[in-house]
């Protein structure tokens, strides 16, 4: 087969990928992954799999040295000598690091000791993507390394407590991760970036908010309380999508998180611990995104029970989380499930597990819509009918 034929095939795949929806993109990614493995020898498979931790470490080094941002901002390739001048690093050491980063595609080699941006570079020049990598390397990385020994020591029993999970063993602490994090501001900051990282598909494009809104009473009433809402990225997305929606949008989170939140028109920020009674009464929506997967069932029920007394007759709880299918679980969902288990004793839940959780809290799910190929969904819960 000629090089031209390969280029034609590659162009067709790129074109199809650009035109297809989220489900189609996932299918193409899966086929490419299978194709790659089919071409590998046993040695290749072992080395490729084992290189994962090193690739993340190399990305972290590039973030720390500002390599990604420098390449993104430069119109011309940057030489090793220029990077040495920028960073103060040893020429020999930095040369070895840069060539390995290039070998894995994190950056692109354009000549001897000369580099430019790759597709990965452009991603990690984004502060939220970079912060997400830092968080996963610093926190999830040590937990992942310890996981096999932890499971063996516990005879492979369920992890159901955030006070007795892999995190405590990895970090030598009796604290839960959320108790430990505020004592380490740099990790709180990177967690905020991970939470703020934009997903390719948003709930605001799929939830029928105008229909559910009904006859919302007045602009001075609270339309939505974004509980545990971090920097307010979901409320900002809602306001951007529907700029004329009546009512107030309130983002609630702990002070350490809100300290890094940027003000936004039409968005209010309020310090609140969601284990304490909800102070905002009669909001139309109480929205929680990626809150419940952080917690075991007992704490999830407690969070829900803090909201219920504040709800009015027309109030709804919107839960923006994954709903794990019985088969064909996307790797991103399965990966996240074990990350939550390791660090927090948390879990990504099936629909049956969500129903059971609502039952324990005195709620019921009246609507459920999976809105992306990674099984992210909106669950609408109300007080259980008697």
UniProtKB/Swiss-Prot annotation:
Substrate binds at residues 137-150. InterPro entries: COMT-like (IPR016461), O_MeTrfase_dom (IPR001077), Plant_O-MeTrfase_dimerisation (IPR012967), SAM-dependent_MTases_sf (IPR029063), WH-like_DNA-bd_sf (IPR036388), WH_DNA-bd_sf (IPR036390). It catalyses: 6-demethylsterigmatocystin + S-adenosyl-L-methionine = sterigmatocystin + S-adenosyl-L-homocysteine + H(+). Residues 177-197 are annotated as: Substrate binding. Pfam families: Dimerisation, Methyltransf_2. The active site is at residue 293. Its EC number is 2.1.1.109. Pathway: Mycotoxin biosynthesis; aflatoxin biosynthesis. The keyword Methyltransferase applies. One of its GO terms (molecular function) is demethylsterigmatocystin 6-O-methyltransferase activity. Catalyzes both the conversion of demethylsterigmatocystin (DMST) to sterigmatocystin and the conversion of dihydrodemethylsterigmatocystin to dihydrosterigmatocystin (DHDMST) during aflatoxin biosynthesis. Belongs to the class I-like SAM-binding methyltransferase superfamily. Cation-independent O-methyltransferase family. COMT subfamily. This is Demethylsterigmatocystin 6-O-methyltransferase. It comes from Aspergillus flavus (strain ATCC 200026 / FGSC A1120 / IAM 13836 / NRRL 3357 / JCM 12722 / SRRC 167).
